[in-house]
Each structure stands twice: as C-alpha cells, then as structure tokens.
C-alpha cells in the first residue's frame, strides 16, 4: 500500500489559511462538539514530551503523534495518520508539524473573527516562531492589517501594545508576558503558547476582565494555566462559537485539541481530491 503523503509544501498549496479558517468554522457550525473528544495522552520523555491525539468524524479517524521538545530545538515534531472511517484502512499521511502550524491559527481566528473590529488591525505578536508567524499570516488572510509588531525576549514588550487591536501570544513563557492594564478596553487577545496548567502568557487581570473563549471548558480547566492560575471556573468560560455578540474585550485561550487536526487534514484531502477528481482515497 502506498499512501499519499502531504508535506508542508503540499499542505500550504492545497489549503491556504483562509480556507483552513473556513473549514474550522464549517465544522463548528455543522455541529462538531469539542467536548466529545478524548483528552490527549501525554508522556514525559528525556528531551521533552510525547503526545498522542486521536479524533474521529463521520468520515474519518485520525491520530497525531507529536513530540514537544525542550527549549533550543524545533518545538513541535509530528506525523498525522488519517484513516478511512468506513474501512479503517489508512488513507493518508501528513507532516504533523505543518498541520499544527496551519490549524492552530485557523482555530484562533475562527474563535475571534466575530469580534475583530471593522478597520485595519494593529497587531502585536509575542513569539517569532512558527505559531507567531502562522497567526500573522492567517490574520492577514482574513483582515486588513495596518501594522504588525513582533515581540521577542530580545525586544521586550513594545510600546505599541497600548494601541494594539489584536495581541497574539505564541511563546513558551511560563509567566505573563505583559501588564494587561496597558491594553485597549476593546482588545482581542489570543493565547496559544502552552497546554500546561502551571504555565501562562497572560495575567489574572485580563482573564477576569475579558470574555474568555476556550475550545472546550473541561479541557481549559485541566490544561490551560492562564485559566487555572487565574482561578477561573466553568461559569467564567465560553466555548468556542458560543460567545455573546457584542463582547468587547475578548481573550481566546487555546491549548490545541485533536479534532482540529482532523478537520484540517480532511480539508487538505478534500482539496487534493477536488484538484484530482480521479484520485481515490
């Protein structure tokens, strides 16, 4: 059996960021329930962490096998295996790191798009790695950007954060990156850097002043240090797609879930089959 393999270049060619966002939005609008998924399995290994992330849909099953490396190495290395849902035979393999780099900002933007102001956006991004740059690319695909400032350990917190419409946190930080008192009242903040309950990128004041959107309430209370360390409860959290219209200060806290990889992998496969109608799964 020879399986199709989608490397980073193929994934980027077949599913540009705006189509990845649309795939996530369609899945959620179509009734996908993030709370129905199973938690990731995590194992500490000498150089970092090993993760297994399985998910199932009406047409496919899939699993991502990923490692999260300690500082100084590429953070995420992964492979994704997609299975046909009817036969359970392997259907395709994917570069799991590229899939992660695409799906994480797609989910973030799907979560906050209803709350983005209708003007060119000033964006501040903490983190110059794949996720920081992926969020920049995805935001630019769905909105006009007036300015983008990238903040790193070397640069510190830019003064422009006070004017930012959107702040993205995509780092390995374990403590808040900035004082939220410096932010606009109507800011949209995206925090996706950690899935550990003892690490956070934003402070308690932001968590308590914002509408806090999460992928799944139980997952956030188990894995998201921004939520846990702020002392938030289930009543303080809003599942993705359920935030009230008109919310002004918004925080999306994402830790990454297996359904997201499956949704985007299926979208890549559909795009390839659409481009090559005779190709069987």
What residue ranges belong to the model's regions?
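Rossmann-fold NAD(P)-binding glycine/threonine-rich loop
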Residues: 192-244, 262, 267
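Adenosine-nucleotide cofactor-binding segment
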Residues: 144-177
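N-terminal ligand-binding/catalytic initiation module
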Residues: 1-101, 109, 119, 269-270
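C-terminal catalytic lobe of FAD-dependent flavoproteins
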Residues: 247-281
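A short helix->loop->beta-strand "cap" motif at the edges of active sites that frequently abuts
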Residues: 144-145, 184-187, 209-210
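Rossmann-fold NAD(P) dinucleotide-binding segment
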Residues: 166, 172-188, 204
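A short, aliphatic-rich alpha-helical micro-motif
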Residues: 160-162, 183, 207
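Glycine-rich adenosine-cofactor-binding loop
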Residues: 105-108, 116-143, 152
């Amino acid at each position: 059996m020879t399986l199709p393999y989608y490397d980073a270049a193929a994934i980027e060619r077949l599913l540009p960021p705006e189509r990845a966002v649309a795939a996530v939005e369609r899945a959620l609008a179509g009734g996908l329930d993030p709370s129905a998924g199973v938690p990731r399995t995590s194992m500490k290994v000498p150089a970092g962490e090993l993760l297994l992330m399985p998910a199932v849909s009406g047409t496919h099953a899939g699993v991502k096998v990923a490692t999260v490396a300690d500082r100084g190495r590429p953070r995420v290395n992964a492979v994704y295996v997609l299975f046909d849902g009817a036969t359970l035979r392997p259907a395709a393999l994917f570069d799991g790191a590229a899939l992660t780099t695409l799906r994480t900002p797609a989910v973030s933007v799907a979560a906050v798009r209803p709350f983005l102001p209708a003007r060119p956006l000033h964006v501040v991004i903490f983190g110059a790695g794949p996720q920081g740059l992926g969020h920049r690319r995805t935001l630019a695909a769905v909105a006009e950007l007036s300015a983008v400032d990238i903040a790193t350990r070397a640069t510190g917190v830019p003064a422009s954060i006070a004017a930012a419409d959107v702040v993205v946190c995509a780092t390995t930080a374990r403590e808040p990156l900035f004082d939220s008192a410096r932010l606009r009242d109507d800011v949209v903040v995206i925090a996706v850097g950690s899935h550990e309950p003892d690490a956070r990128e934003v402070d308690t004041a932001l968590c308590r002043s914002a509408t806090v959107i999460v992928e799944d309430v139980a997952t956030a209370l188990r894995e998201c240090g921004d939520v846990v360390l702020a002392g938030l409860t289930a009543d303080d959290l809003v599942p993705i797609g359920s935030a009230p219209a008109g919310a002004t200060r918004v925080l999306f806290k994402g830790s990454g879930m297996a359904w997201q990889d499956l949704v985007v992998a299926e979208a890549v496969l559909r795009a390839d089959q659409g481009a090559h109608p005779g190709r069987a799964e």
